Every structure is written in structure tokens, then in C-alpha cells.
Amino acid sequence: MAYSIANNHLLRKTFTKIKNIIDIPNLIDIQKNSYRRFLQQEGVSESRNNTGLEAVFRSVFPIKDFSESASLEYVSYSLSKPKYDVVECHQRGMTFAAPMKVKVRLVIWDTGKESGIRAIKDIKEQEVYFGEIPLMTDNGTFIINGTERVIVSQLHRSPGVFYDHDKGKTHSSGKVLYSARVIPYRGSWLDFEFDHKDILYVRIDRRRKMPATVLLKALGYSAEQLLNYYYKSEEIFLTGETPSKSIDAELLTLQKALVDVVDPKSGEVIVKANRKFTKASIRKMVEHDIKAVPITFDSIIGRYASSDVIDPATGEVLLECNEEVTAEKFDEIKAKGVESFRLLFIDNLHITSSFRDTLLMDKISTNDEALIEIYRRLRPGDPPTLKSSLALFENLFFNPERYDLSAVGRLKLNFKLGLKVWPECTVLNAPCMFGAEDIASFDELFRLLLAADNRFSQYVLARLPEDFVKVLRKHEPSQPVAEKLREQLLKELNNLVKDPDFYQKELFTGLALSQQTVALTEAIEGGVFEENRRVIEVLRRNRMIFEDLYAPVVLTSPKNDILEIVRYLIDLKNGRGAIDDIDHLGNRRVRAVGELLENQYRIGLVRMERAIKERMSLQEVENLMPHDLINSKPVSAVVKEFFGSSQLSQFMDQTNPLSEVTHKRRLSALGPGGLTRERAGFEVRDVHPTHYGRVCPIETPEGPNIGLIASLSTYARINDHGFVETPYRIVLDGKLTNEVRFFSALEEEGHAIAQANAEVDAEGRFVNDYVSARKSGEFILVHRDEIELMDVAPKQLVSVAAALIPFLENDDANRALMGSNMQRQAVPLLRADSPLVGTGMERIVAKDSGVSVIARHNGVVESVDASRIVVKIDESEVDETGTGVDIYNLIKFARSNQNTCINNKPVVKVGDVVKRHDVIADGPSTDMGELALGQNIVVAFMPWGGYNFEDSILVSEKLVKDDRYTSIHIEEYECVARDTKLGKEEITSDIPNLGEEALKDLDESGIIRIGAEVKPGDILVGKITPKGETQLSPEEKLLRAIFGEKAGDVRDTSLTVPPGVEGTVIGAKVFSRKGADKDTRTELIEKAEEEKLRKDEQDEIRIIRQSAEGKLHRLLIGKSLSVKLEDGEGNLILAKGKEITAEALKSLSINDMGAISVSDDGQTDDNVSKVIDTLNRQIELIQSVFEDKIQKLRRGDDLPPGVIKMVKVYIAIKRKLQVGDKMAGRHGNKGVVSRILPEEDMPYMEDGRPVEIVLNPLGVPSRMNVGQILETHLGWAAKGIGWRIEEMLQKQTSAESLKAYLKDVYGDDEVGTFIDGMDQEELMLVCRRLQRGVSMASPVFEGASEDKIKSMLGKAGFHSSGQVTLFDGRSGDPFKHKVTVGVMYVLKLHHLVDDKIHARSIGPYSLVTQQPLGGKAQFGGQRLGEMEVWAMEAYGAAYALQEFLTVKSDDVSGRTRMYEAIVKGKHTLEPGLPESFNVLIKELQSLCLDVELLEGEDE
């Protein structure tokens, strides 16, 4: 609870009652983990998992040429060190990226002319440069062309199968039509749908629909197989006097008895006619040995045959499969002596005839016709052949290259349909796979070979000798295989493997082969073919053969994916099963950086694959090396385009630390493959029950993107499948445990989950019998024994920004939304001040955002100044390669993406002990390691002379004087000298036609000095550009010849300060081309940088020397010498045998100490030389690192083509608070500063303290954000307690009573112990810090109650109402009523009036219309629209209006006449023709209307 790093950490009094079970996961892990998984930078290729970049390479390679005489295989990839580090990339506008090399192998095959056997002819392996891949910085961002960017995670629809209905809107009858859609990760979409006549149709890729049975027949199923797959059938017996049917318990329970069912022996009636069959009656029938149930003749008529009924005598088909039984047909069947036949069970109540009707209307009967029909639908106009139809169909859903469900899609399909297919199987119609562990023995292979429905076994058995197959077939699969049979089978298989014909056939059409070759090779090698290495040799040589030999472990599943998808859809129609909710988070998943980039790489590699194939076929492959084939340009281009211009690659919002963190945790439903703003409906944007604890229900933008862009909740994380998970505590047998597990939305379904604030006793049992809980999206009251899970914390519901709002529970959600969005726009202030009333999240955000400097190791602070901190690491933490010193170079006044100022200031002092992960320097908007976005301000809620009408804010001048709301903004200006056609541009201070005054701040290189104060129009960098040569008159030529070059051939193109910018130059950077001469300014900058590096180097060496000296002293002092000890000049210091003292060692260098020999067992001497060796090695390491850095510094820069020199100038602008600036609280209460009032005029309290801001009380009730009032009261108490501590210090109260008061305030045993343990000095330090107010934490949904606030007000010595009498600062009279006064945390937002205000007299004009441009950026004018003209007309201001519409706008000649008139002092206005009139005439003429303007003299 209490932090102390040299006691400068804040103690926060917290109001939470719930103990912390699990820390909030690192806030930017979502980005870092995803990219780490994608890059797998650490691993070597063999150990890398098949994910991310590795998976892309493995899936695209090997690339074979068209004749398959050569193949290019992928071996591994490796990344080198990036050329520039993060800081350099920022400065030079480079991309922070690492060069990538890929090792590939080109294998050339030789195919024998006669035998057709392929053998390896040649193998060439080579590392090929494969472009650069951007790296992620430690803070989860990318640096692209010098700017920090964030890749936002995308929330998209998960692959899998989705069932839905049209809610009765499609057909006029209002009938509900069901449909199913299979969405793959990539590949063709498959839709099944019913029409209003209950016929089932299928669409492939949203093409024209066809009966679904066409697709099923194309899979190779006959009509009879399909009917019997989807329908149960009953056997009808015709042997007795009346017909009867078989007893099927499942079907009978759905029916009534048509006639009495009688026990033939006793004559007892078991089931009466027209009574339903029950489970009991069926059991009774079985007990009485009744085999069939009597039925009536009528019940058979109108039913359908489940298979052909055949005349037993002639073999003639009497009744076809799916044909209706009529009276005539029935008589014929009976007459022909058929004893029994089977009918489909369709009762149109539980089971409808829709599938049977579809089969009936489908005119296609064979597999081949179905394939051709599908080809016709997908490729209309192409003449179909059976071969092309088969190839197309195979590629649609069964070819892993064209169709990929992804592991997630397979998982969802298995989950929905209850299948047990291998997760590696990412195509449809997938066979069930046996894992390597399933092939336990040879017997297993045997069983698989003899499995009747295995296409591989059929293929193999057809090629083995017939007599051997007979022997095999006799073998009982459950019995072990005899030795002799085993040998014989191996021999036969071996012959097959050698036989080239074995591989000729298209073996596995429609079978997917798992990519996990390794596990299975081992299984086949280790278990199955142990005795026969020959097979494996062949396998090794030919990967294709190898995959074919996988087939022993392939068993085609009787449950085919597509059949099961259709079955579920039919069940839905029959009233079983449930449709899917596409907004459920189990059906939406997150694609984070890694996956998005993986997809881009795949696109690039596929493009490259085409190019490689073409090259292989065009040139002689045998003479080529891999690098001749591979051109990585397409891949680099795709990646570059993704980072540069993808919708999901965004310019990082760097206004303050919170906005950075939030941007990295954002989830967007937009972007490629996602939704579009215009088409997204209400449902997608709405909050869904599964968002609880996963996606924040509050934080989302206002406007068109509302609900499409969301933010991850505080505890949420993303699992390997891309689903969002949230943690819950496990409840076992009604008792709460401390075990925490993460659940995705699907896993959480059906569990009863208690709220985090449910009351629990000391043993973890729920206090109340009935507890409020969530179950399947509903809030219910559940008995405590039924609770299975419990939330970990109340704030797990909301995102980081919303969790920073105290008393969030008392705000209206719409206002909370504005509050969380506006905190992200708070400008970092000059003096950061952490909130008195916080939520306890401030420290976590500041730490995880990466803006503050965090200690890397435990250690002691050696030295501190404004720009760096040196920490000597504890010896226990120094490893072999480390130097034992951490140097933290602090960032000073750097510019952020939003032009705010990034600056680190140390919070430690020399001698402080720091622990790993401690904050040692604050960043922007952080105070003592806590987020500090605004200021704690004393506010009063009252009207004041109309200056706080409608959300205006009245501010005291004191805030401006004290610089409470002053912020620094840094602008960067760039000047580039290019090589032009007319000559080189030059950066110089020698600029023609400019006086001394204008150039006074430039140095001789033409660059402004640091520290210069600049105004609009001042020159920052002097630059001249050659002019085009003009024709000179003879006189001029003569003069030129006589007087030499005149400055007439260059023009001034200097970089000047734009309008509206005033500030101080704080930095200049010069980049010059390699090989170009350096100017003096560049040399100065380089020299300063070099000195800084040298200082770091010397400090590092000094500290490790000191530490080595310390070690040597500890080793040597107290030991006796074995040889005499002399100094460098030969003077005796200690005689032999004397004991070594600290005094004696003082004058010796480290090397001298190395020469000391001690009389012990040699252990000390060894240790001494070890210390010295380590020291020398570390010094060498440090020196080489710094030499590299200095070399880099002296090298020229890589500049874009045509650029000779580039100068960047940085100007710091100090912005004080002024009228027109936007301010806001944390509860969505925003306003604009309307007046800055002198301090003496502000309302003041009885003790003379004036308030600092006056707010309008009417802004609270209608907006329903009462949280701000509670915050004000609690803040008032916090401030009051601070004042009381100040009083006590002034009165020099005893330490005991101070401690007692503090313990009373904090009321926490842990803090109590901490306070008791303080000495006088520490106590004073803490109390001085607390004078500004005691920091409190009121976490969301478990904040301070009203009673607690009143008790805190009491401790501060205030009235419990929180109201005081105020006096008018102007008259001194008290106001009539008491006023609510307190402390509120108020932010200054990034909408500053200085950035928006703008004025122009003359400026740029549009080319065509000659009207002034618009907008501040273009230095544009003010538009006068239609309505403004009406207003001017209403006033009768005719001349002003004429001026507006002509000379001030687009009357070009009138404009020049106007200038003349002003210069000459005439005040006449002669308007001419506006240019836009000419445009109008030209437009009319372009429409072939002959319009002319006739100008005549005035009559």
C-alpha cells in the first residue's frame, strides 16, 4: 500500500474494501506479445513455432516450376541489427527496421527417361537478402519515416459457420427462413438457405443459387445415401394379416398407436389406439417380446421409400428410392411377395420433408453431372469438361492453398457441430486425423489399412497380390499381427513404394494432409516401419511421396463437415438448435499487429511466387543461384504500403501518456476486411452482454464511429486464437478461492458469475443466501451454492481511461464517455500535479505507458543531473557480459506527434537505493510516477456576473501568474537545400537585399542561434536559390563584365516563421550528404554530441574501476604479503610477510594491485587476476561500443535523392491559459475560459482565501454527472487535511500527535505500521509533501460512500455539507446563500485558441476563381455565404457588401486599383467584373450556350 523510494512516492488513502487478487496485465502487452509471436526473433528456425512469419514462409515454399524439375525450398530466416537506433530514426526521418536474410535451397531434379523415377541432381543453398522488416519499439510502436505510428488491432468476424434467420422479412408471408454461412479465413464463402417453399439451396461466393443436393452429390454421395443420412427410416413388415413396423424407441416416442397393441400370448392391451407411446410402454413391449407394432394400411400411403424396393423374383425395381407410396404401388409390392421394405420417417411436425423435396426437385443424378453443374454456375460461358470441373471443385474448399479456415475456424466448426477433427485441418470436408500418439503400434496401421471407408486402404489393397489380400482380410483386427504376416506386409508395401506407378494417380482428391510432418515422420519411423529403413529413405528423398505415406493415418470421417453443416441447418428448421448472434464476442475475434502483418507478408510472398515460377520456366534453372530467382521487392512494397497507408496504421496519438496507452489498446471494426461506417447498423455498434470485462462499454468516439471503435477493458487480454479473455476467480463448492483463470466469451457461457463486490466472509463464503450474478447475458439472483465464478475487481468492466474517473458510478454514461475521451486530449503542463482524488490507476498507467524512466536493475544512484542518471548496479545482478553500470539518458524537450513537449525530470537523488521497476524519472504529465493530466483547483459552484453562462469558465488570474496551466509546445520546421536544374541551392547567411537587423540571429552558416526569440516573418534558415537566366541588354552585359557578378541571379527562399507562432529556438539539427563539406554549425553540433558520448564512456569506466578497486581491497586487506610490495618508482611500501592495509593500497593503481602476491593457497591471487581480467574485458567492450557510436556520428547522412543539406529547427512556444482555451473535468464537464479575473475580484472565503475557478451550477443537474460534485467534496476534505497538517507543522506539534492524526486519516493498518516506523526526518518529508493535500483513491464502482466523504470533511474541520459562505471580491459583501466549494481536478485540453485564431488581409488566391483560399493552413480568408449576404442586405450596408463581393474577393483589376487608391490617399471605389463571373460564362459556353457580355457606355 505504501511506497517509499527515498520517501518521495505518494501515499494514497484508498476506499476500496476488495483486496487485490491479480495485478492488471501490462497495458501494452497486446501489441508487444502479438509482434513477438509474429517475429520469433530469438529462436532459430528449427525451434520456431509454425506461427507468424515462419508459418507464411512454410506455407508458400517450396516453389516448384511448372515441369517440377526444380524446387525452391525455404530453410530459415534471420534478422540482423538495425542500422539506426530509435532516436536516430526520429531525427533523420528513417524507418526503424532490421535487415532480414532468408536461407533458401534450390533443388534440381533429374527424371529418368525410361523408369520415370526422380532423383536429386543438384542442391544449392544460399542466404538471400529479403528487404527490411520494421521492428517494434519497447513501447509497442513503430517508427516509420521518422514518425511514431501504432497498428490498431482489428475486431472482425471470426471464421467458422454461422446460422441465422431473416426474422420473417424476406417473404411476404412472414415465414422465417433459415440460412447458414461458412466463412473461411481466406477462400470461397459457402451459403445454405431455405426459400419459402422449404427447398434448401446453396450459393458459392454469393453466385446464383442451386439446390444444395447438387453440392452434396458432387462430394460423391448418392441420393439414397443422403436420404438415409438425414432421415431415420422404419421397416414395414407385410408378412402378417395387417402390416406392422419395427420398434425404434427414438421414433416411436414421437407417435401415437394407430390400433391397439396387444400381447399375443396373454391378449393384454399394452397400448390403446390413439394413445402416445411412452418410454414405459415401449419397455413393456420389449419385455413381452413384441417385435413389431401393428399399423393401418392408410398410414403407409403417402410416405416415401428410403431405398429401392426390388421384386425378389425378377430383380425389377418396384418402388424407387424417395418415391411416394400410392395405393396401386402398395398393392403391387404386396402382390409380388415382398416381405418388408423401409420408409422414411417424416411426420411434418418434428421432422419436415424439406430435404426430401429438395432431392426430388434436383434433376441431377450423378456425381459427374453435379461437378459440371457447379462449374457452369461459377464459370458461365466456359465450356465445362469433367477434368476442369473436378479441378475447380477440388480447389474451392479442399485445397489448403486456396482455402483456409484457420485454426480458429476449425475450432469454431468443431465446437458448433460437435466434430472431432484435428485442429491442423483447415479445409472443409476434412478427414478425421489420428494424432501421432494414436499410431501406437503396427497393429494400429493394420487396423487403418483394413478400414473399409479409407480411400488409401482401398487404393493400396487394389495394388497388392489378390491371394495376399485374402489372407489380410481374414485377419481379425482386434488380434495382434503375427510376425510372418507383418514381414510379408512390409515386403509388399516396400515393393509398392519402389513402384513409380504407385504415385501416378490423383491419389487424395478431397483429402487434406496435415502440415505437421515432423510428428508423423517420427511416429512412422519409430513405431510403424521400425524394421524397414528403405521406406524412410525413399520418403526422405521425395516430400510428395512422404505426404502420400501420411495416408495410413488418414481415415475419412463418416461425419463430413458439409453434411454436418446441412444437418444442423435442417435441425434448426425443425426447431432444434439455436441461431448465432454475430455480435457475440465468441463470434468476433481480434487481429492484432502480428496477424495483420502476417497477412500482408502472405500477399507479398504469393506475388513473389508467381515471379519466381515465371523465371524458372524462362531460364535454365541449372545455371541459376537462388538469389537470381528471388526478388524481394514485391514483399517490401506490400509491407511498406501497409505501414504507410493502411487504415489500421495510424499516426500515434501522443498528446499525453494516457492517449498513447489507449491508442495501443484500441479495437477497430473498420479497416480492410472489416465494416464500413456507412453500412454498419445499430446492432454492431451496441453494447453486448459478452463485452463485460472484455470491451469497455463507455469509451468509444462520439460521431460516425460510435461503437465501431472500442477499447479493451483493464484486465482483458487476447488469447492465441484472437478471442478476448477476462479473468475470474474460481468458486468451488460455494467457497471463493484465490485461483484466477481467464475465460473467453464462449467458455464463460452458462456459468453463474458473481459480482466482485458480493459480500464474502473471512473464509471466502458468500454472506447472503442469494447473490446477484450474471448467466448467459442475463442478470439473475442465484443461490450461493450455484455460483461458479466471480469477477476479480469492479474495474474489470471498464477501460483504462474510464477507470481513471473517480465516482464514475455516479455519472451518466454519455458524460462518462466524454470524460474518458477528453482525458486523452489533456495537454501536459509545465508543472504536473497528480490528482488529490484519484482512482489508484494513475501509477499503473504512468508506468506501463513507457513515458517515465524505469530502473532496469537494483542499484544505487551514482550521479544525477537534468539530462542523465547513472546507477551503479548491485553486484548480485551483474552478469558476465554486463558492465555493472546503467546510464539513463533522459529525453529533454523533445517534440511529440501532437507538438506537445516530452521531457524527463529525475525524481531520485545521489545515494538513493533503487529497485528494479522503480520510477526514477518522471515523463510528461507524470508526477512522482503517477499520471498527472491537470491541476487540483479550488472551485466554487455559483453564477458570477454572467461570465459562466452556458459552460463558460471564470478563472482567477492567479492560475496564470503561477503558471499552473502553462504548457510548452514544440514546432519543427525543416529547410532543404536541393540540387536544381539551374544549380545548387545554398544555405548561407549571405542573403541579397536584407538588412543587418533581419540577419542578426543567424550564424555564419545561415542557421539561427539557439535561444533566439522569434516572431512571425523572422528568418530561421537563410537559403538562396539560383534564378532562371534572363536575356540581358547589351548595356547590362557591359556593366556585368566590368563590375563582376551581381546578386541578381539568385532569389531569397529562406525558411521563415509562419504567422501565429512566437517562441524560442531550442534546437537545430543539420544533416549533410555523405562526402559533402561540413559547415561550422554541423561541426559544433557533432563536437557537443561527441563530448556527451565521451563523458558517458568515462563515467562508465570510472564506476566499474571503482567497483573493481572495492573488490580488490576486500580481497587483499588483512592478507600477508608473500613478496615485498614496491610502488612504480621502486620505493618500498610494505615488506614481505607484512599484513596489507587500506592505507598501503591507497597509492596503488589497479595494475599494481594485480602484481601483489599473497601467502595463502593461491586462491586470492586467482581471484585478483579474475577481477582484473573482467575489468579489462568490460573496458574494452565499453570503448568499442562508444567508438562505433562516434564513427556513426562522423559519417554523413543518407538523404533523399537530390538533397544536399537538410536543416531542422525546433521552436518552443510557451502557452499560458487565456480566454478561449477549452478546459474540462474528468466527468464530461467541459467549458471555455470566458474571462480571467484579477485575484482580488474573485469570491473569497472567511479566512480570505480566494477560489480559483467559478463554475456554473446549472451544468450539473441536466447532465447528470453528479460524480463531479462528490469529487469536489472529497477533494475539499483532502485539501483541508493538508491545511491542518500545515497548521500543525507551523505550531511545531509533537511527532506523536502528527503520527496519530495521520493514522486517523489513513485508517489502514498497513499504513499505520509504515507511519510508526518513520523517524523525525522522514515524517517531516512526508508531512511537507502532504501540505498540498492528502491524495485519495476512490476506485470506480467501489468509491467513497457519502458517509465516508462526510467523515473525511469532519477530519478536515469542515462542515459536512461541504458548503461555505463566500464574499464578493469586488464589494466585500457576503453572497446570499452558502456555496459548494471544493477541489476539482481540471484539465487544459488540446483545443487551444492560439491554434484556431487566424487573421488575413491579403494572401493566396485560388487559380480559377481568383477568390481567397479558405482555412488557417492555407492562410485563407473568411467566407461570406448566402446567409451572411442576406444579413448585410438587411442592414442596408450596400457599400460594405459591394466591397466584400468584389475588390476583397475576386475582382482582380479592382484589387490593384484599390491598392493604388490607398497608396495615393484617394478614397474612391471602382468595382470591376468579378472573376467568378467569367468562370460562369465559360461554364455556360461549355454547355454550348452562346453567352456574351455586352459592354456599352452609360447612356
From Swiss-Prot:
It comes from the Bacteria. PROSITE patterns: RNA_POL_BETA. The keyword Cell membrane does not apply. GO terms for cellular component: DNA-directed RNA polymerase complex. The RNAP catalytic core consists of 2 alpha, 1 beta, 1 beta' and 1 omega subunit. When a sigma factor is associated with the core the holoenzyme is formed, which can initiate transcription. One of its GO terms (molecular function) is DNA binding. This is DNA-directed RNA polymerase subunit beta. DNA-dependent RNA polymerase catalyzes the transcription of DNA into RNA using the four ribonucleoside triphosphates as substrates. It catalyses: RNA(n) + a ribonucleoside 5'-triphosphate = RNA(n+1) + diphosphate. PANTHER family: DNA-DIRECTED RNA POLYMERASE I SUBUNIT 2. NCBIfam families: PRK00405.1, rpoB. Its EC number is 2.7.7.6. GO terms for biological process: DNA-templated transcription. Keywords: DNA-directed RNA polymerase, Nucleotidyltransferase, Transcription, Transferase. The gene is rpoB. Belongs to the RNA polymerase beta chain family.
